């Protein structure tokens, strides 16, 4: 039974899903705007927002924890150096999802995922 199991499988194995969201998180933090399918966008919010909350308190332990989840030293630096100070006063809701129609070919619902207050 799947009682109380949160998260969406998205038709992938656990390792594939973990790697995909790791890559999507790095892309989101690098470009601050990405386009993806709506279910992936909604699940990405559950992965990326806690990292920004974690980065608001800068410590070696938090940097190591963020690195263990992102595996990209440059993006960890940007997360703690640029993004966390930007959202210091905001108590959550760092990511905005904007629907942008359906994809040609398979008619999948698409969405833009962007960081709020980006320049």
Swiss-Prot record:
Query: What's the superkingdom here?
Result: Bacteria
UniProt keywords, alphabetically:
Ribonucleoprotein, Ribosomal protein
A GO biological process of this protein is: translation
Q: Where are the transmembrane segments?
A: none
Which PROSITE patterns does this one have?
Answer: RIBOSOMAL_L17
| Pfam families noted in UniProt | Ribosomal_L17 (PF01196)
> Can you provide one Gene Ontology molecular function annotated for this UniProt record?
structural constituent of ribosome
Cellular compartments per GO CC: cytosolic large ribosomal subunit
Q: Whom does it interact with, and what assembly results?
A: Part of the 50S ribosomal subunit. Contacts protein L32.
What PANTHER family does the record tag this protein with? LARGE RIBOSOMAL SUBUNIT PROTEIN BL17M, RIBOSOMAL PROTEIN L17
Q: Which family does it belong to?
A: Belongs to the bacterial ribosomal protein bL17 family.
What is the recorded name of this protein? Large ribosomal subunit protein bL17
Q: Identify the species of origin.
A: Psychrobacter sp. (strain PRwf-1)
């Amino acid at each position: 039974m799947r009682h109380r199991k949160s998260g969406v499988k998205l038709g992938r194995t656990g390792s594939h899903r973990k790697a995909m969201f790791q890559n999507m998180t790095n892309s989101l933090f690098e470009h601050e705007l990405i386009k993806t399918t709506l279910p992936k966008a909604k699940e990405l919010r559950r992965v990326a927002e806690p990292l920004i909350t974690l980065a608001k308190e800068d410590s070696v332990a938090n940097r190591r924890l963020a690195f263990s989840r992102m595996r990209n030293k440059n993006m960890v630096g940007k997360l703690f150096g640029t993004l966390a100070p930007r959202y210091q006063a905001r108590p959550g809701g760092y990511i905005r999802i904007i629907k942008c129609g359906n994809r040609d070919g398979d008619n999948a619902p698409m969405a833009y995922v962007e960081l709020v207050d980006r320049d």
